[in-house]
UniProtKB/Swiss-Prot annotation:
It comes from Rhodopseudomonas palustris (strain BisB5). The keyword Transmembrane helix applies. The gene is kup2. The chain crosses the membrane at residues 10-30, 50-70, 102-122, 136-156, 168-188, 211-231, 246-266, 284-304, 336-356, 368-388, 393-413, 415-435. This is Probable potassium transport system protein Kup 2. Belongs to the HAK/KUP transporter (TC 2.A.72) family. It catalyses: K(+)(in) + H(+)(in) = K(+)(out) + H(+)(out). Transport of potassium into the cell. Likely operates as a K(+):H(+) symporter. Its main location: membrane.
């Protein structure tokens, strides 16, 4: 009985977190198709054609591509572009495609941030715009109300969303039931609309009106925004609950609502100004606006939490500098808060709300990031099909070719909207890509320089004679290199002429898996003369904790008393090089990021009163 309750609870939670983004798409998808920047005439022929396109887009891009195919490509249970990237880079290591695929994954992560800025803005704006259906006099209040709602949402992030999060599942279940009921009520008035399930209507629409259907694709894709979240959030809930929730509740509710909106438009074409809020009786508009706003906030929360998760993954995979990561729950390790990410998102979202003013204006910006990410996911998963699943090459080409053709069609329909707002996700993607690749390149140059300057450990051990005093206690030297002597140790020897009785050269590494169990966390070897090499491994979904890892060294017969242990860290500063490894502006950007990165002491949870920092100058 308790196991059944747990499954139901997991199912409800999955509905609350995973499907918020795609669940709010009915607020604007059909409206934008018929009244957006390239409006389509509202007549039965076009309504049937668009509904057929929506139906098969949802079935192909979400049900087949993500739910059936890509969700099989988990990285030890985790999903998402960076998890998929880590899996693919491991599979292609040593092959020519390794670097291009890595760059594709980085582009997907960069585009995600553009998407995560647009989602809260368009979701809450489209929900609050329902007030205009009550009376047009409320139109001037839409943007201020949206700003207040979003400000409150971002302000509570530091306190955690555990308590409020318990309401997410039930509220979203109510939302999807409401979508279904509204859809059924309207379909009953025009049941013939269900004939649009046949793909012939989509094909006829495309062949009869090629240009119009091309423009329509740019808005139809809004029906699948958030589809990638099914894969991204797989690590939190598992494959089965997400698939069950999709097939049993979310998919039927979405399709019923879209067909209900289509039935309404056939019966009353003037409802196109806001078909969703016109689906029910007048008395229902205000409660529906309230429920839609709650659903939009939940969709925004899911994206914000996803942005924190991607930031942590990027830090662990060496794509971003160290940032402060706050755990907001003692029970859920996945509930984190990244202050820098939070307030950067907030400022961008506010700029979008104030700058674009309406969901219609924002819709043009939305599609490019989504279609680009979906296209990259298709390319990455093709290598999983071929190298991990060992599918027949003909099957891989057929499946990937079909999915990629659909992705390219939608991407092409959205790229023409650059001037109307599509420039924004491309601009954010470019900035994010520049930051990610500059940090990755800079750290690679630093590692190269450190390796070049490194003194072999055996040379230092031989040089340790009777004249070098041994201080009592333990010295832990943190170093990125797994061989040689850390610069901090050389500086300590040079200036203090002393070495501790026990010296532990410690390297924290990130595995290409999301989690590393405690049993595999540490590996310690005795080098001799009181020196030890310690390797601490974490997954890219975990936050490093060096003192906690030292406790695990008991299995090697070593115990660490924090009061007699000193931690030595190198503080790197960079000087101009005659042969720079990067352009000057990238060197300056890298230096700026290094200067503003969270201190290693804080990031690795090392007691500040036990830390000694020694400066090191490097040319990059």
């Amino acid at each position: 009985m308790s196991q059944h309750k747990n499954r139901v609870g997991l199912l409800v939670s999955a509905v609350g977190v995973v499907f918020g983004d795609i669940g709010t798409s009915p607020l604007y998808a059909l409206k934008e198709t018929f009244s957006g920047h390239h409006p389509i005439p509202v007549n039965p022929e076009n309504i049937f054609g668009v509904l057929s396109l929506v139906f098969w887009t949802v079935m192909l891009l979400v049900t087949v591509k993500y739910v059936i195919v890509i969700m099989r490509a988990d990285n030890h249970g985790e999903g998402g572009s960076l998890a998929l990237l880590a899996l693919v880079t491991e599979l292609t290591r040593g092959r020519r495609v390794h670097y291009p695929l890595m760059m594709l994954g980085v582009i997907a992560a960069a585009l995600f941030y553009g998407d995560s800025m647009i989602t809260p803005a368009i979701s809450v704006l489209s929900a609050v715009e329902g007030l205009e259906v009550v009376t047009p006099d409320l139109r001037p209040y839409v943007v201020p109300i949206t700003a207040v709602v979003l400000t409150a949402l971002f302000a509570i992030q530091s306190r955690g969303t555990g308590l409020v999060g318990r309401l997410f599942g039930p509220v979203m279940c109510l939302w999807f039931i409401t979508l279904a009921v509204l859809g059924i009520v309207n379909v009953i008035n025009a049941p013939g609309v269900l004939k649009a399930i046949s793909p012939t209507y989509a094909f006829e629409f495309v062949f009869r009106h090629p240009l119009m259907s091309f423009y329509a694709l740019g808005s139809v894709v809004l029906a699948v925004t958030g589809g990638e979240a099914l894969y991204t959030d797989m690590g939190h809930f598992g494959r089965f609950p997400i698939r069950l929730a999709w097939f049993c509740l979310v998919l039927p509710a979405l399709l019923l609502n879209y067909f209900g909106q289509g039935a309404l438009l056939i019966h009353d074409p003037s409802a196109i100004q806001n078909p969703f809020f016109r689906m029910g009786p007048e008395w229902m508009v205000v409660p529906l606006v309230a429920l839609a706003t709650f659903a939009a906030v939940i969709a925004s929360q899911a994206v914000i939490s996803g942005a924190y998760s991607v930031a942590r993954q990027a830090i662990q995979l060496g794509l971003l500098p160290r940032m402060t990561i706050v755990h907001t729950s003692g029970e859920e390790a996945g509930q984190i808060y990244v202050p820098f990410t939070n307030w950067t998102l907030y400022l961008a979202v506010m700029a979008l709300v104030v700058g674009f003013q309406s969901s219609s204006n924002l819709a043009a910006a939305y599609g490019i990031a989504v279609t680009s990410t979906m296209m990259i996911d298709t390319i990455l998963v093709s290598f999983v099909m071929a190298l991990l699943w060992r599918w027949n090459m003909a099957l891989v080409i057929t499946v990937v070719g079909t999915l990629l053709a659909v992705d390219i069609a939608f991407f092409s329909a959205n790229i023409i909207k650059v001037a109307q707002g599509g420039w924004f996700p491309l601009f954010i993607g470019f900035i994010s890509f520049t930051v990610l690749t500059t940090w990755r390149r800079g750290r690679a140059l630093v590692r190269k320089q450190l390796k070049k300057q490194a003194v072999p450990l055996d040379v230092v051990l031989r040089a340790l004679g009777p004249n070098v005093s041994r201080a009592r206690g333990t010295a832990v030297f943190l170093t990125a290199a797994t061989d040689g002597v850390p610069p901090a140790l050389l500086h300590n020897l040079k200036h203090n002429q002393t070495v501790h009785q026990r010296v532990v050269l410690t390297t924290v590494t990130t595995a290409e898996t999301p989690y590393v169990p405690d049993s595999e966390r540490v590996h310690m070897t005795d080098i001799g003369d009181g020196f030890h090499r310690l390797i601490i491994r974490y997954g890219f979904m975990q936050t490093p904790d060096v003192p906690a890892a030292l406790v695990l060294c008991k299995q090697f017969g070593h115990e660490f008393n924090m009061m007699s242990t000193s931690f030595f860290l190198s503080r790197e500063t960079f000087v101009p090089s005659l042969n720079p490894g990067m352009a000057l502006w990238r060197e300056r950007l890298f230096s700026f990021m290094t200067l503003n990165a969270t201190r290693a002491t804080t990031f690795f949870k090392i007691p500040t009163d036990r830390v000694v920092e020694l400066g090191t100058q490097l040319e990059i």
